[in-house]
């Protein structure tokens, strides 16, 4: 329930110019207001437009109790109004908010003009020269400052009246400045394109409030773009025309003819492209479907798909290459001398030989099949030939793992390409990477746009080796790059299948391969007296609620006690869905309450649907290249700074600061989705396996979850749900034409 409070600003205790966070003392209009100071003032905190003493505020929000500062009113909506009393006017004008007016001039102006003061400032500012000491120049400066402050307040008030939170209103004003009101009134759908956190539905609500017709061209076009972006969010690079039309009609509640007209306008503006591609999905014999459709692309993704296909074909055909001069003796040895040298298997030798002799190649295989060993030997050969090597992965976690496994420096693809938010990618066709070979690990996580930018940075003659497990989930972003490259035959592929002896003793690895073959995993029974304990378990639970109870007990008590693992640092809960008792959201709430409960005297802050406390496990939800944190990075919340409205999060030993208005890019991470865990490994993984998650019970999802575990994997659920997942090999079909474009060269 929302609380209300109104009153006159007595003084400003703190104001952050960047994000609008304010701490002020308010003289309330109401009686019986909680937590008043001895002077009868209430403490108000939150993101506000710049306000001044004497100003009247109508506030909506919640009363909260701070461990250090006591009772406070946390603002969600603020509606300021200029004071009308003589004393209020003097304090307001003399607060410093209006440049050129200090306390003395404020008193003179209010005394001279009396009740007409506001009218003079609004309509007759030239009359300010009637005040001794105010000449024409100062009068014009005061007029400009007054109009600027009035504009800011109009913008904030307008946004609040249309349901925009103060945090989001601050973002909008910081983006557009004084043009914010004009822009929002003229085309509220522009907000969806420019402001993170404003979606089509929010923009549409504002447009309806403004009286914009439901058949307005801007609305139709924004709805079509939104429908295309929804498909991108599901991994598709394009939308089939029929499904796009149906969803747009349903979303916009309009006739198909209006959608067709909107599509034509978007094509003319080059915001979308239409291209003939085969019907998604292969024929029963594995060939490309002869039937074609008009695929609708957002223009950047059309360029990414066609460009990636063209560049990959060019790279694959560039011979002789920068590795063509490696002596044949190195190719015959295929492993370095030394005490620790282990002979490669025939498949590993084939993979290394292929990587050295083909400009583009793929190495794939499940856990324990020797991909890392193969890479170490390959790198040794390259170093012995004085070749320039670069190693990269799509995420920071995967890059760190690659560096540890190979003993070589590795970076994210974005860092390798010199990405910055302001200038984009430094390395491209005009400034390619000065390397002889690039090895990309966890290549199943490469989405289409990143692949396109990566290929642009590789000069012909450079070798590219894509390494990954094609049987895992595809990338979170649009496309199915690794799968499409393999399916196209555009590059030779080596699949490692033999499990090496040291890996064969792990139930995690052997069960992962069973799952991938469509076989039920084996659940061993723990024998306390045995020398070696199993690393794979099932705790029986018939429904999601019982599974959630097991998970909380496993994470907080059983696993720490029996395996000596830290519940926050070492154990990661993965779930296939967000909703339900055993979904990500509910598990986060329960695990936070168990591992990091609210404590008297310790700070906490509710932001964007989560309550945060120091010590919380949190995850970054989108790439932020300025902060150098990336989608899926997991860290620990170290500090909540009330005065500056700052959250400090530690990622891999590095402290990163977030303004509270940026906290929508964070979430709790005691439990995360399986998709978000791609590219990461954890000492222990705990996951629910219940039939309530039926829609998400798929083989590749279970396989991906199990292969995230290094030392321990525990399922809470039932064999029936596991069997459903193991037997469900129906992967969600992604609309992508990359494999066809590669085949049709």
Descriptions of predicted regions:
Residues 1-325, 335:
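Accessory, non-ATPase domains that flank or precede helicase/AAA+ motor cores in DNA-metabolism machines
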Residues 97, 130, 365, 393, ...:
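The Walker A (P-loop) glycine that initiates the GxxxxGKT/S ATP-binding motif of P-loop NTPases
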Residues 280-438, 492-501, 508-543, 600:
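ASCE P-loop NTPase motor cores of helicases and related translocases
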Residues 388, 434-438, 461-465, 712-713:
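Loop/turn-to-beta-strand initiation segments
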Residues 413-460, 672-675, 703:
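Conserved RecA-like ASCE ATPase "motif II neighborhood" in helicase/translocase motors
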Residues 443-454, 470-480, 697:
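Conserved ATPase-coupling elements of RecA-like P-loop NTPase cores
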Residues 470-627:
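Conserved helicase motor core of P-loop NTPases
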Residues 517, 633-745:
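C-terminal accessory regions
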């Amino acid at each position: 329930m929302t609380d209300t409070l109104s009153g006159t600003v007595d003084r400003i205790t703190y104001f952050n110019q960047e994000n609008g966070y304010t701490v002020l003392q308010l003289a309330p209009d109401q009686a019986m207001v909680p937590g008043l100071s001895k002077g009868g003032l209430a403490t108000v905190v939150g993101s506000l437009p710049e306000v001044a003493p004497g100003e009247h505020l109508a506030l909506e929000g919640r009363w909260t109790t701070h461990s250090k500062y006591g009772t406070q009113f946390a603002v969600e909506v603020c509606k300021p109004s200029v004071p009308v009393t003589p004393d209020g006017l003097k304090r307001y004008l003399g607060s410093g908010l209006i440049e050129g007016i200090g306390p003395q001039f404020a008193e003179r102006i209010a005394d001279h003009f009396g009740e007409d003061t506001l009218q003079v400032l609004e309509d007759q500012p030239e009359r300010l020269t009637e005040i001794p000491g105010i000449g024409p120049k100062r009068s014009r400066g005061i007029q400009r400052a007054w109009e600027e402050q009035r504009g800011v307040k109009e913008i904030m008030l307008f946004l609040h009246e249309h349901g925009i939170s103060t945090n989001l209103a601050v973002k909008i004003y910081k983006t557009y400045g004084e043009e914010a009101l004009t822009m929002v009134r003229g085309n509220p759908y522009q907000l969806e394109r420019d402001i993170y956190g404003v979606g089509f539905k929010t923009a549409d609500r504002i447009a309806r409030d403004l009286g914009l017709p439901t058949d307005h061209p801007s609305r139709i076009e924004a709805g079509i773009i939104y429908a295309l972006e929804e498909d991108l969010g599901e991994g598709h690079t394009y939308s089939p025309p029929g499904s796009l039309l149906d969803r747009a009609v349903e979303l916009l509640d309009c006739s198909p003819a209006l959608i067709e007209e909107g599509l034509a306008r978007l094509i003319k503006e080059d915001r979308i492209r239409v291209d003939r591609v085969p019907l998604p999905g292969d024929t029963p014999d594995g060939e490309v479907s002869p039937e074609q459709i008009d695929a609708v692309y957002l223009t950047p993704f059309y360029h990414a798909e066609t460009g990636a296909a063209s560049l990959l074909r060019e790279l694959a055909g560039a011979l002789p290459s920068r590795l063509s001069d490696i002596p044949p003796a190195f190719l015959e040895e295929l492993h370095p001398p030394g005490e620790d040298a282990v002979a490669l298997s025939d498949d590993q030798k084939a993979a290394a030989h292929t990587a050295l002799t083909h400009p583009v190649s793929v190495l794939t295989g499940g856990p324990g099949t020797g991909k890392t060993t193969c890479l170490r030997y390959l790198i040794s050969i390259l170093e012995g030939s004085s070749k320039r090597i670069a190693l990269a992965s799509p995420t920071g976690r995967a890059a760190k793992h690659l560096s540890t496994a190979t003993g070589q420096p590795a970076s994210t693809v974005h860092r390798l390409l010199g990405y910055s938010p302001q200038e984009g990618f430094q390395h491209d066709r005009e400034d390619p990477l000065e390397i002889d070979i690039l090895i990309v690990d966890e290549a199943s996580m490469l989405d289409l746009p990143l692949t396109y930018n990566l290929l642009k940075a590789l000069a012909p003659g450079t070798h590219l080796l894509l390494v990954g497990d094609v049987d895992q989930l595809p990338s979170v972003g649009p496309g199915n790059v690794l799968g499409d490259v393999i399916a196209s035959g555009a590059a030779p592929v080596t699949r490692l299948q033999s499990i090496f002896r040291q890996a064969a003793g792990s139930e995690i690895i052997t069960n992962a391969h069973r799952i991938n073959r469509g076989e039920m995993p084996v659940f061993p029974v723990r024998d306390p007296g045995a020398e070696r304990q199993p690393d794979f378990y099932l705790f029986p639970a018939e429904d999601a609620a019982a599974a959630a109870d097991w998970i909380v007990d496993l994470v907080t008590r059983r696993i720490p006690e029996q395996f000596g693992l830290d519940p926050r640092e070492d154990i990661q809960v993965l779930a296939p869905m967000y909703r339900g008792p055993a979904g990500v959201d509910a598990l986060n709430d329960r695990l936070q309450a168990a591992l990091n409960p609210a404590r008297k005297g310790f700070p906490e802050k509710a932001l964007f649907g989560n309550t945060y406390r120091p010590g919380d496990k949190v995850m970054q939800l989108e790439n932020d290249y300025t902060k150098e944190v990336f989608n899926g990075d997991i860290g620990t919340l170290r500090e909540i700074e009330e005065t500056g409205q700052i959250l400090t999060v530690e990622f891999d030993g590095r402290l990163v600061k977030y303004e509270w208005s940026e906290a929508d890019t964070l979430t709790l991470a005691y439990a995360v989705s399986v998709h978000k865990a791609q590219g990461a490994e954890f000492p222990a993984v705990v996951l629910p396996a219940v039939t309530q998650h039926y829609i998400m019970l798929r083989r590749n999802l279970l396989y991906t979850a199990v292969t995230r575990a290094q030392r321990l994997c525990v399922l809470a659920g039932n064999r029936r749900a596991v069997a459903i997942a193991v037997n469900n090999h129906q992967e969600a079909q992604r609309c992508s034409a990359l494999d066809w474009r590669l085949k049709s060269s």
